Amino acid sequence: MSEFIPTWKQPSHPETLQVIKGATPYTASARSLVALPAGALFSKITTAIPAPKKTYTSVQTGPGLNIELMSDLVYCNHSCSPSLEFDMSTFEVRVSRDRPLSVGDELTFFYPSTEWDMVQPFNCFCGSQNCLGLIAGSQDMEASVLSRYWLNPHVKDLLAGKQMTVAPESTEEISLKA
């Protein structure tokens, strides 16, 4: 799979983010050009289009629903200590609730906050002291780990459904005879 080529006019967010191209494929990133308080609106998502299938650049908006951002927001990488939250229920990108954003900060979000499963899982190298290692989507993560993060409503709903379908711990035989 080759690195994608943007089809939108760049820069798409010249006042708020700068794309930094890496020396090798898949190493581009985005840096903040603004300082904002925790929880502040960073950007609305206004250029997205439905994605006919899940890709490594798509963002999940609901069960079986994905979009392509069609903007430089696609360069916001994953981090286990994210600087942003992608709220797909409001199509807004906000500064993480637990810390402010400074000029020069890398723009990142916690991919499992939007993704139930991923077409291209990867080993995380975010460098956070809380780095989780393999990132493959929220369906493969422990609820106790996910509880430390802000999650989109569709991910919370899918997690609730998953917890309801987990088999009981009991090894006793259950009789269904009337």
Curated annotation (Swiss-Prot):
Belongs to the class V-like SAM-binding methyltransferase superfamily. Its EC number is 2.1.1.-. Coiled coil: none annotated. The keyword Hydrolase does not apply. This is Methyltransferase flvH. Keywords: Metal-binding, Methyltransferase, Transferase, Zinc. One of its GO terms (biological process) is terpenoid biosynthetic process. One of its GO terms (molecular function) is methyltransferase activity. It comes from Aspergillus flavus (strain ATCC 200026 / FGSC A1120 / IAM 13836 / NRRL 3357 / JCM 12722 / SRRC 167). Pathway: Secondary metabolite biosynthesis; terpenoid biosynthesis. Methyltransferase; part of the gene cluster that mediates the biosynthesis of flavunoidine, an alkaloidal terpenoid with a tetracyclic cage-like core connected to dimethylcadaverine via a C-N bond and acylated with 5,5-dimethyl-L-pipecolate. The tetracyclic core is synthesized by the terpene cyclase flvE and the cytochrome P450 monooxygenase flvD. PROSITE patterns: POST_SET. Zn(2+) binds at residues 124, 126, 131. InterPro entries: Flavunoidine_N-MTase (IPR053201), Post-SET_dom (IPR003616), SET_dom_sf (IPR046341). It catalyses: L-lysine + 2 S-adenosyl-L-methionine = N(6),N(6)-dimethyl-L-lysine + 2 S-adenosyl-L-homocysteine + 2 H(+). It is an enzyme of class 2 (transferase). Residues 120-136 form the Post-SET domain.
